[in-house]
Structure formats: structure tokens, C-alpha cells
Regions:
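Active-site-adjacent structural segments surrounding the nucleophilic cysteine of cysteine proteases
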Residues: 2-99, 198-237
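Conserved active-site-adjacent core of cysteine acyl-enzyme catalytic domains
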Residues: 82-236
Length: 237
């Protein structure tokens, strides 16, 4: 079960992914050889989770704030109540939600931004390839990406990145990323090698999702016009 956990602090109950959305103004495309930076964070859009259950809900709320470029006033508890019946967790044990419920909430509440779009979970076998995928989707869609951290116990939002070139112009080297965490830093820069994304090691969902997520790098990603309705597992070589 995804649950918000802070190191050196008593374990917080419940599964709660936390996305912190980082918003900014999307830059105009530049020359392929020019270093590229994009960050969607803005301070008024950030939300801190209201309790141990609501990091996925807080993440959803702030993600949508960053997309809308304003505080939408979404209720974290309303979001959580939407997520839980639609996620893959054991209902007798869960208190928060998981990547499936989180992605469904982002898609359902998208209309509050004034438009419609789809988020889906993705499970990658390579951390660096996963982060490059996240950076490219931020550049292509102008929307943040959710990262599952603490081995499936928490989640944050990747709001931006720095790279050797614009991902829309071809292959690139990812150098830095910007993260918003609903229970920690509202906006923090990490090296690509030092990102908080790590392997999902929880076994509290249905067998199908346990198999899909376990041992992989799991993200909640804004999709293009043809999303995979059941998510996707990507083998990165």
C-alpha cells in the first residue's frame, strides 16, 4: 500500500501518493544544441496534504492547480473518496490510494481546469529511462508527472527539468529535475542521478497490479491522444 512515510518519523498509516505540482511558463522551442529548461511550478498552486491518507489527493489537487495556473479549491477528501473505489488496493486495509486511483482522479477532475486530458500509470524497468519519459511528456503536454517514491510508500510531482536539449527536438541528456512534495519541500532541484524515484516494493494490491508494479519505477504520466487504458509496463534496455 502506498503510504506517506517520513524517514526518522513514526510511520504514517495509509497509502498516500503525494504529488507536488511545479508550475511555470513553458518556454518556446530552442535550437537542438541549446540547453533546455522547463518548470511548471508556481507557489500559489502548491498544496500540503491534510493527513497521512491524502498525499495522492493533495498531489492531484496541486497538479490541476498548476495546469490551470490558479488555485482551484479542490477538496482533498473528495478526491480521496473518488480514488479509493477505483484503485487496486485491498479495501479492508487501505487508507490512502495507489497509482491506479491517482491516475483516475487526475483524469476525472481534469475538467475542473477547463479542458479534458488523460493520466495513466506507467511502470519502467530503468529509472533513467523513466525520468527521460517524464521529462519528454512534461515538454510535450505542458503538464506535471507524478513519481512514486519511498518504495511505493509516497509520491511526489516532477514539475520540471533541465536537459541538454529540448526533448521535442530529439534525444537528450537529462541533468536535473524539479520536485514538489506534499509533505516536504514545495520545490526542490535534484540531479537526475539523485532523484527520489525508486523501485516499487509494495504487495498490497490485486495480483495483476502487484505483478505490474513490483520492482519497477512507477509514475503517473499525462498521455497523448491514444492512451493505454490499463496503463503500461515498459521494458527499458
Amino acid at each position: 500500500m502506498l503510504r506517506t512515510i517520513i524517514r526518522h518519523v513514526p510511520r504514517l498509516a495509509g497509502l498516500v501518493l503525494g504529488c507536488a505540482l511545479v508550475a511555470g511558463v513553458a518556454p518556446t522551442p530552442t535550437d537542438a544544441a541549446t540547453p533546455f529548461k522547463m518548470d511548471l511550478y508556481f507557489g500559489a498552486g502548491y498544496e500540503r496534504q491534510i493527513d497521512a491518507r491524502t498525499c495522492t489527493a493533495a498531489s492531484t489537487a496541486m497538479t490541476l492547480n498548476f495546469i490551470a495556473r490558479k488555485d482551484l479549491g479542490l477538496s482533498q477528501m473528495d478526491i480521496l473518496r473518488y480514488e479509493q473505489p477505483r484503485d487496486a488496493l485491498n479495501d479492508a486495509k487501505q487508507r490512502g490510494s495507489d497509482p491506479l486511483g491517482w491516475s483516475k482522479a487526475l483524469t476525472y477532475f481534469a475538467s475542473r481546469t477547463g479542458t479534458n486530458f488523460t493520466y495513466m500509470w506507467e511502470a519502467h524497468t530503468s529509472e533513467y529511462a523513466a525520468l527521460k519519459r517524464a521529462a519528454k511528456q512534461i515538454a510535450v503536454t505542458g503538464r506535471p508527472v507524478g513519481l512514486v517514491t519511498l518504495n511505493g510508500g509516497h509520491a511526489v510531482v516532477m514539475t520540471g527539468f533541465e536537459a541538454s536539449r529540448d526533448p521535442r527536438q530529439g534525444d537528450f541528456k537529462l541533468t536535473y529535475l524539479w520536485i514538489s512534495d506534499p509533505i516536504a519541500s514545495s520545490h526542490k532541484r535534484y540531479t537526475a542521478a539523485g532523484s527520489p524515484l525508486d523501485k516499487y516494493l509494495e504487495l498490497d494490491a490485486t495480483p495483476t497490479y502487484d505483478k505490474a508494479w513490483y520492482g519497477k519505477y512507477v509514475m503517473v504520466v499525462p498521455q497523448g491522444s491514444t492512451p493505454n487504458r490499463v496503463g503500461t509496463v515498459v521494458v527499458n534496455r
